């Protein structure tokens, strides 16, 4: 491909590896859903720590990596990988958030550039460091922070999960109230004062 030679391995072996990877992906997705559910509860109760955020980013990255691995097997299997491709498509849940929205929720001064740098740093961690929550916290922008440091979410992720709220309105709400706790404490009049809310 493009002048590069790739060794195509035995189809039966690849199918076995692909099926194992699919099973791993299913397990990782279940774990990620549980972690996200726990994070939501902690956010609402205002009990989130940096360790909770790092653990969520870790699980998201592990899911991303196994999806990439399965995609590689599908490519190598060609026509023999159709079933695996279908299974992968089913497991690519569009409702599962990416690490970017977690970073926008928690980084001290989030902007597209440092979010991009954080995502790249997370993706570049080796297998040894991806299991170390302190390393994860450091590379995404929390160097020098303890894992038990309390954090306040801005509310991007939870708002993004409400389909009836357009992204632009979510952004305005976060900009207006600053934190999820402040948003939850807002009165109806406070909410209506935000452009695009309540027919405003």
Predicted features and spans:
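Long, charge-rich alpha-helical interaction segments
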Residues: 36, 43-72
């Amino acid at each position: 491909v493009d002048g590069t030679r790739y060794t195509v391995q035995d189809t039966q072996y690849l199918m076995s590896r692909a099926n194992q990877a699919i099973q791993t992906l299913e397990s990782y997705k279940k774990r990620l859903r549980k972690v996200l559910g726990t994070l939501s509860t902690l956010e609402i109760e205002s009990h989130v720590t940096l360790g909770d955020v790092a653990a969520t980013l870790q699980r998201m990255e592990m899911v991303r990596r196994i999806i990439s691995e399965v995609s590689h097997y599908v490519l190598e299997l060609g026509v023999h990988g159709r079933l695996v491709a279908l299974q992968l498509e089913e497991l690519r849940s569009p409702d599962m958030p990416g690490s970017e929205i977690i970073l926008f929720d928690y980084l001290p001064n989030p902007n597209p550039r440092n979010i991009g740098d954080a995502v790249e740093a997370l993706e570049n961690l080796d297998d040894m460091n991806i299991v170390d929550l302190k390393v994860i916290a450091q590379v995404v922008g929390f160097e020098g922070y303890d894992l038990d440091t309390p954090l306040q979410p801005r509310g991007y992720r939870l708002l993004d999960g409400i389909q009836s709220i357009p992204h632009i309105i979510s952004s305005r709400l976060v900009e207006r109230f600053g934190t999820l706790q402040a948003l939850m404490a807002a009165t109806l009049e406070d909410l209506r004062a935000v452009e695009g809310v309540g027919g405003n």
